[in-house]
Design a protein with these regions (language model features):
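Membrane-embedded alpha-helical bundles that constitute the cytochrome b-like, heme-associated redox core
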Residues: 2-214
Length: 214
């Protein structure tokens, strides 16, 4: 009888260990995949605003459809990341720690950066759905917050993600920041060049005088 009890306990412990491994790896993979997709979405968005395009012999992959598709995929993997983090028995995060900033028992500041980024992303998504009602100009101003979301998520991943300790994880962050930073600088330079460019002066045609022959 004792052997049966010991065997049942060992089997239960093995199942819990397996479950913990699955949820932990899913949370890690979901979060990192969401970050990569978000970075690609931001890169495509900045490329569109700076009039960059793939070589003429390649398919036209830099377009609004690709930007929206990457954003949708990133949103899905954010949901996977949040759900797996909540059910993971190792991290032991409650719903309040997942959705309320600065109350987490683990790196509260950097966890808060991810939570704030989540709420900003929701606001940007709602503004996109209401673009016809709020106007294009207002939507453009709100859409710029995507860069803030990207910065907050980068900090969240760097300081809370375990994959930051790997060379490939750190390399992905560095390449991502370099690409986004370079495109952002190009975007600012183009905007400044357009502002400094002299605007054409409208020429008002003068009425022609009619001469009378005497």
């Amino acid at each position: 009888m004792c052997w049966l009890l010991v065997g049942a306990v060992d089997e239960g412990a093995g199942i819990m260990t397996l479950w913990q491994a699955v949820t932990w790896d899913t949370a890690r993979a979901g979060g990192f995949t969401a970050y990569v997709l978000l970075a690609l979405s931001v890169i495509v968005g900045l490329a569109l605003t700076t009039q960059l395009q793939s070589p003429s012999k390649w398919p036209r992959i830099i377009n609004n459809e690709m930007h929206n598709f990457l954003t949708l995929l990133a949103t899905i993997f954010v949901g996977v990341h949040i759900l797996a983090t909540w059910v993971d028995p190792f991290t032991k995060f409650g719903w309040n720690e997942i959705f309320i900033p600065f109350v987490s028992h683990y790196h509260p500041l950097w966890m808060a950066s991810g939570i704030i980024a989540l709420y900003l992303s929701i606001a940007i998504g709602i503004s996109t759905l209401l673009r016809s009602k709020i106007g294009y100009k207002m939507w453009r101003h709100l859409h710029i917050l995507t860069l803030v979301v990207y910065a907050l998520v980068t900090l969240h991943g760097l300081f809370t993600g375990s994959d930051t300790q790997t060379w490939w994880g750190l390399a992905i962050y560095l390449v991502s920041v370099a690409l986004v930073g370079g495109l952002l600088i190009r975007r600012i330079r183009l905007a400044n060049a357009q502002k400094s460019r002299p605007q054409p002066v409208a020429v008002v045609p003068q009425p022609q005088r009619q001469y009378q022959h005497r």
